[in-house]
Amino acid sequence: MAHYKGAASEAGRAAQLMKKREIQQQEIEFRKKKIEEELKLDKIENKFATHYDAVEQQLKSSTIGLVTLDEMKAKQEDIVREREKKLAQKKDEKDREKQRALEAIQAEKNKQKRQIQALSFNLDDDEEEEEEDDEDHDKKQLKIKQEDQPKPKWTEIKEDILPIKKKKICKNPDVDTSFLPDREREEQENRLREQLRQEWVMQQAELKDEDISITFSYWDGSGHRRNVLMKKGNSIYQFLQKCLELLRKEFIELKTVMADQLMYVKEDLILPHHYSFYDFIVTKARGKSGPLFQFDVHDDVRMISDASVEKEESHAGKVLLRSWYERNKHIFPASRWEPYDPTKSYDKYTIKDKDKSKK
């Protein structure tokens, strides 16, 4: 047998082809022997004739003298039974020889398969080709066996169900599968997300329910400072309603006024009624002259220290009639006021402490 010199994968394929040729040659020789055996008895009549001729010959040779008809029939039955037994034994021996030959072929094929797998670098292709060869070989062997077996009666015919070969799928445990969809992982993430959402909602609800003391000044050209207790979740409209209840006792012009007719101005910004104090606290909103999220009041920074230094101290918000603003919006301080815009940044109106940054 010549040895192939070249790549290992090509050597494996060459070995497979040689193995396939050997199997085909063995099948051809097996068929030749089978044809030779069948040619010995050409027809089915000759088979039966030979069988009964042998029985008659043995009966004649074993019968001496005159015998009764019953003895003759009994002896003939014994000879036929013995003859059939010998034929069955020969058939069993022939079947066993065929089985041993098939097992030897299969063992040689498995041995060559292991050798090819040990030498080949392309195991997947080789395995697929070998599996195809195995299937073809199994089909041929099954066909040969069916030809050797006697044809069954029509009442005994059953469909042979061949088992379907399933390829084993091996998984690599080291491969990262985090990008693949995983129902359990997604459900766990959703539960965690929902839990965090509920915790955040509870925290915000607790924050909105906290009390806050708001110092404001009723402005009619001069300031009248008052203080009211509210919740952080209350809106500016609710705050103005409470201010109105407090101021009606002192100011006659407010007795017939509704909260819609009032304005709340803080840090030179007119705050819309639908905003809540919580909105300004959470976003750390700033106005022109100070923070909008601080509602406690200190003395004016311009009175106690350098006005160029930025402070986190806020001024008292102004509560005033909208009619007063319309009459005096061209006069300071109303001329400086403007509606609050959440998209606008008011940082440029603040002055940093330059001396502090140098230190």
Swiss-Prot record:
Biased composition range(s): Basic and acidic residues: 137-150
UniProt superkingdom: Eukaryota
GO cellular component terms attached to this protein's record: nucleoplasm; nucleus
Protein's GO biological process: chromatin organization
InterPro entries named among the record's database cross-references: FAM50A/XAP5_C (IPR048337), XAP5 (IPR007005)
Residues covered by region (Disordered): 122-150, 339-359
Any Pfam family the entry gives: XAP5
Biased composition, class Acidic residues, residue ranges: 123-136
GO MF annotations in UniProt: RNA binding
Family: Belongs to the FAM50 family.
Descriptive protein name: Protein FAM50 homolog
Organism (species): Drosophila melanogaster (Fruit fly)
